[in-house]
Amino acid sequence: MIKNENREAKVLAQNICMSVFKARRVIDQIRGRSYEEALMILELMPYRASYPILKLVYSAAANASHNMGLNEVDLFISKAEVNRGTIMKKLKPRARGRSYLIKKTTCHIKIFLKEKYKV
């Protein structure tokens, strides 16, 4: 009997000060890619969202190698998702004693790494 182990390394970052749409633009480029290919893509992307995601991919690979004993060369990004986080509200003073509401959006990022199946 062949035992199929579903071992996944995951990493979660919460309340990253970034728009969900801007983070999704970067995440969509690396979903389903190998670990090394995702690192190359993230290092060359000109977006501000790529640096926190790069740190998360590094962390997920470190979790996979340290906690589960997986080889980093065989890893690929099985799932990557960006969800809306809390919205921080601030008041900006305006003329004549009024104030406007400023909404600072945050997002939650989850990245899952799996090992490629060897045939």
From Swiss-Prot:
Keywords: Chloroplast, Plastid, Ribonucleoprotein, Ribosomal protein, RNA-binding, rRNA-binding. Part of the 50S ribosomal subunit. This is Large ribosomal subunit protein uL22c. It is found in: Plastid, Chloroplast. It holds the Pfam family Ribosomal_L22. NCBIfam families: rplV_bact. InterPro entries: Ribosomal_uL22, Ribosomal_uL22_bac/chlpt-type, Ribosomal_uL22_bac/org-type, Ribosomal_uL22_CS, Ribosomal_uL22_sf. GO terms for molecular function: rRNA binding; structural constituent of ribosome. Its main location: plastid. It comes from Phalaenopsis aphrodite subsp. formosana. GO terms for cellular component: chloroplast; large ribosomal subunit. This protein binds specifically to 23S rRNA. The globular domain of the protein is located near the polypeptide exit tunnel on the outside of the subunit, while an extended beta-hairpin is found that lines the wall of the exit tunnel in the center of the 70S ribosome. GO terms for biological process: translation. Belongs to the universal ribosomal protein uL22 family. PANTHER family: CHLOROPLAST 50S RIBOSOMAL PROTEIN L22-RELATED (PTHR13501), LARGE RIBOSOMAL SUBUNIT PROTEIN UL22M (PTHR13501:SF10).
